[in-house]
Amino acid sequence: MKIIAGLGNPGAQYAGNRHNIGFMAVDALQRLPSFAPWSKKFKAEISEGEIGGEKVLLMKPLTYMNLSGESVGEAMRFFKLTPADIIAIHDELDLLAGRTRIKIGGGHGGHNGLKSLDAHCGKEYRRLRLGIGHPGDKERVHGHVLGDFAKSDRVWLDPLLDAIADNAAMLVKGDDSQLMNKLALATGSKPEAEKPVKVAKPAAQSHIHQARNSAQPKKLPETGPMAEMLKRMFGKKD
């Protein structure tokens, strides 16, 4: 069993906020045919269903962002799950809008929802980070995350949310590389590939130097006619 928790703030006034992109992603998953209507339990809106043959509990904590861990932790303990069974979907300031990353564990990076999950669930859960971009000025961050997405953002936001739902089985099974490729394809961004390792080449030699090296015998003959001739030429004595 897996818990997929979208992070956000409850209430109509926050519904369109950038900070609520985690809720939006879980809403997209809940629209899959296998999921039940939303109900309330564990201080959250929940919906049970299946993805790729595995039982999944979708959660939207009603505790507000900075107490999200209370809700998710309660469900984790109820079902006797571990942090490895939890997938948190959240907004990420440090990624360009529409870019995505996924990882296990790590720091909370100042995100209050993750900070709460760390405290109540442990740190070794998977995090699907959805980029909302940075406003460029620290003073504008609060207004940016609690501001609504612009109409122009729908160009990448809607395809991203659809792609998360369409490729939900990859999310649940941990096929992270394939999932990142699918999400990048949907938003028109390029997934970052590992940079090839540069192999050091031997220092280039001039053609003359190469010819000298190849023409020069590795060892001079010690006996025979050639040896006698060399002795006479260079005055080498026994």
From Swiss-Prot:
CDD domains named among the record's database cross-references: PTH (cd00462)
Compositionally biased tracts (Polar residues): 207-216
CC annotations in GO: cytoplasm
Alphabetical list of PROSITE patterns matching this protein: PEPT_TRNA_HYDROL_1 (PS01195), PEPT_TRNA_HYDROL_2 (PS01196)
Location within or outside the cell: Cytoplasm
Cysteine pairs bridged by disulfides in the record: none
UniProt-listed Enzyme Commission number(s): 3.1.1.29
One term of GO molecular function: tRNA binding
Lineage top rank: taxon: Bacteria
UniProt cross-references to NCBIfam families, sorted A to Z: pth (TIGR00447)
Purpose of the protein: Hydrolyzes ribosome-free peptidyl-tRNAs (with 1 or more amino acids incorporated), which drop off the ribosome during protein synthesis, or as a result of ribosome stalling.
Protein name: Peptidyl-tRNA hydrolase
